[in-house]
Swiss-Prot record:
<keyword id="KW-0964">Secreted</keyword>
<keyword id="KW-1202">Platelet aggregation activating toxin</keyword>
<dbReference type="InterPro" id="IPR016187">
    <property type="entry name" value="CTDL_fold"/>
</dbReference>
<dbReference type="InterPro" id="IPR001304">
    <property type="entry name" value="C-type_lectin-like"/>
</dbReference>
<feature type="disulfide bond">
    <location>
        <begin position="119"/>
        <end position="134"/>
    </location>
</feature>
<dbReference type="InterPro" id="IPR050111">
    <property type="entry name" value="C-type_lectin/snaclec_domain"/>
</dbReference>
<feature type="disulfide bond">
    <location>
        <begin position="25"/>
        <end position="36"/>
    </location>
</feature>
<comment type="function">
    <text>Binding of echicetin to glycoprotein Ibalpha (GP1BA) receptor on platelets alone results in inhibition of platelet aggregation, while binding to both GPIba receptor and IgMk promotes platelet aggregation and signal transduction.</text>
</comment>
<dbReference type="Pfam" id="PF00059">
    <property type="entry name" value="Lectin_C"/>
</dbReference>
<keyword id="KW-1199">Hemostasis impairing toxin</keyword>
<protein>
    <recommendedName>
        <fullName>Snaclec echicetin subunit beta</fullName>
    </recommendedName>
</protein>
<feature type="domain" description="C-type lectin">
    <location>
        <begin position="32"/>
        <end position="143"/>
    </location>
</feature>
<feature type="disulfide bond">
    <location>
        <begin position="53"/>
        <end position="142"/>
    </location>
</feature>
<keyword id="KW-0800">Toxin</keyword>
<dbReference type="GO" id="GO:0005576">
    <property type="term" value="C:extracellular region"/>
</dbReference>
<feature type="signal peptide">
    <location>
        <begin position="1"/>
        <end position="23"/>
    </location>
</feature>
<keyword id="KW-1015">Disulfide bond</keyword>
Length: 146
């Protein structure tokens, strides 16, 4: 009986410790609404950052946003690490065909940008999306399904 209680308690502790850390996410990634996120301080151009994210997870991409709450969550991750830095996101017209799309194929139904260039960054300080030349280098956020 004592062993059963000890094993049960151990399993409970393990379950509770995994539940808040994104048990389905890679180590050091954060979970929100069924997706895993990680901020990377390394500076890369848009294409290299996207390629890096796809190497982290088979379904990984630069972050896409479906609503303002998701943006707020990502800012809560990125701001402590990057402060006022600009961060690549997965929105692009990389092929310059006037077809704006998320690199992960998500629907483009939430928008917050100005008009210029072909790849997007967001500003941690004011949640503005701004276009930049895709060859510039910035930190970035990767996202993948949990």
């Amino acid at each position: 009986m004592g062993r059963f209680i000890s094993v049960s308690f151990g399993l409970l502790v393990l379950l509770l410790s995994l539940s808040g850390t994104g048990a389905n996410c890679l180590p050091d990634w954060s979970v929100y609404e069924g997706y895993c996120y990680k901020v990377f301080k390394e500076r890369m151009n848009w294409a290299d950052a996207e390629k890096f994210c796809t190497k982290q997870h088979k379904d990984g991409h630069l972050v896409s946003f479906r609503n303002s709450k998701e943006v707020d969550f990502v800012i809560s991750l990125a701001f402590p690490m990057l402060k006022n830095d600009l961060v690549w996101i997965g929105l692009t017209d990389y092929w310059r065909d006037c077809n704006w799309e998320w690199s992960d194929g998500a629907q483009l139904d939430y928008k917050a940008w100005d008009n210029e260039r072909h790849c997007f960054i967001y500003k941690n300080t004011d949640n503005q999306w701004t276009r930049r030349d895709c060859t510039w280098t910035f930190s970035f956020v990767c996202k993948c399904p949990a």
